[in-house]
Amino acid sequence: SVGFKAGVKDYKLTYYTPDYETKDTDILAAFRVTPQPGVPPEEAGAAVAAESSTGTWTTVWTDGLTSLDRYKGRCYHIEPVAGEENQYIAYVAYPLDLFEEGSVTNMFTSIVGNVFGFKALRALRLEDLRIPTSYTKTFQGPPHGIQVERDKLNKYGRPLLGCTIKPKLGLSAKNYGRAVYECLRGGLDFTKDDENVNSQPFMRWRDRFLFCAEAIFKAQAETGEIKGHYLNATAGTCEEMMKRAVFARELGVPIVMHDYLTGGFTANTSLSHYCRDNGLLLHIHRAMHAVIDRQKNHGMHFRVLAKALRLSGGDHIHAGTVVGKLEGEREITLGFVDLLRDDFIEKDRSRGIYFTQDWVSLPGVLPVASGGIHVWHMPALTEIFGDDSVLQFGGGTLGHPWGNAPGAVANRVALEACVQARNEGRDLAREGNEIIREASKWSPELAAACEVWKE
């Protein structure tokens, strides 16, 4: 007789193990599963566990050459989603040995690489991951982290202010540098390359880097504050990206930028290592995230992409605003903002956090609020995001009727007023508009901004 039983068998016989005790070293995943009609949730959950670990669609003789029990993913719990028809949360545990150390790329290839096109599922969404300490320790994480960044910049006790230079495409390098200088001189801490500014015919990267560096040093000399501009090093190849980062370091600027989803995790991790070794801060933009995270029942939640970035490395990352033009629910956003900044985060389903996550002193990432925000939003932003954040006003700076520098002044005055009011114990949520109005009495720049963007 044959040594094994050939043929197709139900996944749930092998991969659905409700009595499994999860190990501290397991990577745990919470999937939102929508099975096809007639497929039981246990089979759907088990199929996810199988296809993203050791399973294939039929029994194979080489299964006998390994210990499936040691290497298989296990679906250990399934619960229906309240208020949704035919949606379940399937919890899957993966043994640590399935993953290459220090590779976000491999982690994602394993967990979400293949299983999302699966026939038995109508839709599938990865809601959260628990990264065990033993795996976290194989990553360097952010190049510097929040505390080191504050010490480098000598800025404490308030959020940092940024501004994306617009029009994002079409300016010459010299005019671009001019816009940067005006914003920094007016009182912003940072200006930013737009995510699609790489090296186009109207402005090559080297020219932009040179003029922006000049703008930074001039503004620093005039204001006595440390300034930065996120120089976008994203490129078509990793080698070209590194070349740009090296040039930025040679110019002596403090920070570079990368589009981590379009650039890819492998490129991002390389850049992150370079930044730590060479004292550059790394600003991360999440272009393409909505392609992955916008659908409620399919894809990946942004909190997973945020966790992955903290492992791969970045000092700032865009995290939505809770106010402005891009969507984001408050509690859920605050959930992944804390996942980025804090060392230890308790499981809390009301904030979308499915697992308790211990980052074991991996440096934190500053969340960046950006997109359609202006001076009237300042009290809300200060209250919601707190000190450890970057508030970015693109149009909210450059749209000022008097120009960039007064626009920057308006934002800085509004921020300092909010921070002062908060430190005096005033309630920003209730008195926010009043605080801004008071401040605008002694700042004509702020008064003009208040006129343009009505509360």
Swiss-Prot record:
EC number: 4.1.1.39
Modification N6-carboxylysine, positions: 192
GO term, biological process aspect, one: photorespiration
PANTHER family for the chain: RIBULOSE BISPHOSPHATE CARBOXYLASE, RIBULOSE BISPHOSPHATE CARBOXYLASE LARGE CHAIN
Main location: plastid
Localization (cell): Plastid, Chloroplast
Co-factor binding comment: Binds 1 Mg(2+) ion per subunit.
The protein's assembly and partners: Heterohexadecamer of 8 large chains and 8 small chains; disulfide-linked. The disulfide link is formed within the large subunit homodimers.
Protein's UniProt name: Ribulose bisphosphate carboxylase large chain
InterPro entries: RuBisCO, RuBisCo_large_chain_AS, RuBisCO_lsu_C, RuBisCO_lsu_C_sf, RuBisCO_lsu_fd_N, RuBisCO_lsu_N_sf, RuBisCO_lsuI
Native source species: Senna didymobotrya
UniProtKB keywords: Calvin cycle, Carbon dioxide fixation, Chloroplast, Disulfide bond, Lyase, Magnesium, Metal-binding, Methylation, Monooxygenase, Oxidoreductase, Photorespiration, Photosynthesis, Plastid
GO cellular component: chloroplast
Function: RuBisCO catalyzes two reactions: the carboxylation of D-ribulose 1,5-bisphosphate, the primary event in carbon dioxide fixation, as well as the oxidative fragmentation of the pentose substrate in the photorespiration process. Both reactions occur simultaneously and in competition at the same active site.
Superkingdom per UniProt: Eukaryota
Family, as annotated: Belongs to the RuBisCO large chain family. Type I subfamily.
Stored SUPFAM superfamilies: RuBisCo, C-terminal domain, RuBisCO, large subunit, small (N-terminal) domain
